[in-house]
Amino acid sequence: MSATAAARKRGKPASGAGAGAGAGKRRRKADSAGDRGKSKGGGKMNEEISSDSESESLAPRKPEEEEEEELEETAQEKKLRLAKLYLEQLRQQEEEKAEARAFEEDQVAGRLKEDVLEQRGRLQKLVAKEIQAPASADIRVLRGHQLSITCLVVTPDDSAIFSAAKDCSIIKWSVESGRKLHVIPRAKKGAEGKPPGHSSHVLCMAISSDGKYLASGDRSKLILIWEAQSCQHLYTFTGHRDAVSGLAFRRGTHQLYSTSHDRSVKVWNVAENSYVETLFGHQDAVAALDALSRECCVTAGGRDGTVRVWKIPEESQLVFYGHQGSIDCIHLINEEHMVSGADDGSVALWGLSKKRPLALQREAHGLRGEPGLEQPFWISSVAALLNTDLVATGSHSSCVRLWQCGEGFRQLDLLCDIPLVGFINSLKFSSSGDFLVAGVGQEHRLGRWWRIKEARNSVCIIPLRRVPVPPAAGS
């Protein structure tokens, strides 16, 4: 039996259903054809319904629908999204690594350049402008000596200070706590070195660059060698015929240079407890000595008015002129430049290739005395922060002065004054440049020309705080 006959047998409902299905098909066709303007009332109803559905589809979606869409993200889409995130992370990591490599390369290049300049003795780090003048309240004062401080040294690790004075004693101080770590008392004359110590004014000291040995020289022509850590006496060098006025170790070695009022320079090997040689040339008592890594040393010739550079292997010397008075102090800035001070009040910057000063600052600490009878304040000590443009000078003008060396060391500009009353007989920068140590006394280290009663015989630790200077516009 055909499907039509079966439908007729079942009755009208079946044909009505079929008619309804046919009408549905016709409506869909009419909708898809756009009704072509011929639809009847039923078509109008269909148009109204379709417009309602369009308005519903244009309505803003609810958050639940958005969540459903996220949940409906396929596995393939999730893999793609995660892969993109991973690639972005890799790209960022590679960029950071590239920046780090570039920074490290710049650092290495800068360090290599500094090493080359340092080996040539021409390195000049610009730090002076960053130094902030310390307040008086920030200066730490260490008291322990009975008489004027004459000299001091700072250990290579900046942990301790050794100071010596006219009371013939040596004190080891802790930088952190300011306490005494050890005291080497005055030795009695004729006691045959028991206990070991100095029996006359200690005029100079030096410490080896590895911090192992301490050397001290006095007016009794003796050089005493100590173990710096324990302050145990090791041995005594004799040979000078007058007061020992200057000592310096060659950096990186245990070779010791000494100078004296007997006008000579001597070379010693401390590790082997041996004398090496003697050099002559100065025409008057030598006042001070300094050395760095090269096998040479520099001396301040006092009243003979010369600065000399001693080339030890060649047994030769270079002679420099510039000051008008007694040259009492000297310090190397780097292997090619040095600073010196004299009792005519002048401070000079020198280059080893020039026989005259590159820069000369007259009356560096001003004038003293009645109007018309003024005299410059003597320069009693100088110091330089190694391989930088920062220099310090001391006098008895109630202050320590910090200076900036200009480009090529051809200028000396005043940075600030640090108030300190008394004779500044010794100045030393820490290796890090974080502080400056001053040895203060009521009298000059080499004599008793004046006495400043209000001064206190002390060691002063002056903090040097740095404030980075912003680069100039357009640099």
Curated annotation (Swiss-Prot):
The keyword NADP does not apply. The keyword Thylakoid does not apply. Acetylation at Lys-12 and Lys-25 by KAT2B/PCAF under stress impairs pre-rRNA processing. Deacetylation by SIRT7 enhances RRP9-binding to U3 snoRNA, which is a prerequisite for pre-rRNA processing. Signal peptide: none annotated. It is found in: Nucleus, Nucleolus. The modification Omega-N-methylarginine is found at R10. Belongs to the WD repeat RRP9 family. Interacts specifically with the U3 small nucleolar RNA (U3 snoRNA). Binds a sub-fragment of the U3 snoRNA surrounding the B/C motif (3UBC). This association with the U3BC RNA is dependent on the binding of a protein called 15.5K to the box B/C motif. The association of the protein with the U3BC RNA was found to be also dependent on a conserved RNA structure that flanks the box B/C motif. Part of the small subunit (SSU) processome, composed of more than 70 proteins and the RNA chaperone small nucleolar RNA (snoRNA) U3. The WD domains are required for nucleolar localization and U3 small nucleolar RNAs binding. This is U3 small nucleolar RNA-interacting protein 2. It comes from Homo sapiens.
